[in-house]
UniProtKB/Swiss-Prot annotation:
Principal subcellular localization: membrane
Key word Transmembrane present: yes
GO CC annotation terms, alphabetical: plasma membrane
Signal sequence, renumbered to the chain: none
Protein name, as recorded: UPF0056 membrane protein bbp_248
Cysteine pairs bridged by disulfides in the record: none
Domain of life: Bacteria
Keyword line: Cell membrane, Membrane, Transmembrane, Transmembrane helix
Subcellular locations according to the entry: Cell membrane
Entries under NCBIfam families matching the protein: NAAT family transporter, PRK11111.1
Transmembrane segments: 10-32, 52-74, 78-100, 119-141, 151-169, 190-207
Membrane topology: Multi-pass membrane protein
Amino acid sequence: MNVEMFDFSIYISFFFSLFALVNPIGMIPIFTSMTNHQSIVERNKTNLIANFSVAIILSISLIFGSFILNLFGISINSFRISGGILVMIIAISMINGNFINNINNQKNGKLDKDIARNISIVPLAMPLIAGPGAISSTIVWSTHYSSVENIFGCMVTIMLFSCFCWTLFKVSPIIVDILGRTGINIMTRIMGLLLMSLGIEFILAGLKASCSNYF
């Protein structure tokens, strides 16, 4: 193997680019808000499925991202806009209390358990963790470093990043115990506002990039 091609600085930079885009530390309150109704076992399962899904999503994006988008004629900017809209819908449900009501209904047996389980993939894994920014960055990274060695190194980096996120989310129950039910309800609405801003940023970034292509 060519040692020069296997440059570890590439993977360190890739890891920190994912860290900056995803901001897993800032995701802890969001994860806590979305899983505070779950038992410890359910929360750990959600955490595992979410981060395992993130590893798969980013790995697929790394290997097949450009091909898939081109195959369906979808631009990264369009994907960013659609992801922003989805984040905004989730944020609205958190702000107006529907998300909390769904949690209470689930506790009373009125909500399908599949709905509660599905948050591990949507919205946690995508678009909140593996969002348009992380996916598009991964695709761009694969175009710059397309050798087999670098693709393999980036895949290992993705696995390590997912394990890092899993570790951070693992300690989230401590936050739940400290804040209590009232604190979680307040934080849920605050996180809804932040998610609303994040969704708007996704949409504006996609629109700005799209407009720059035409003007």
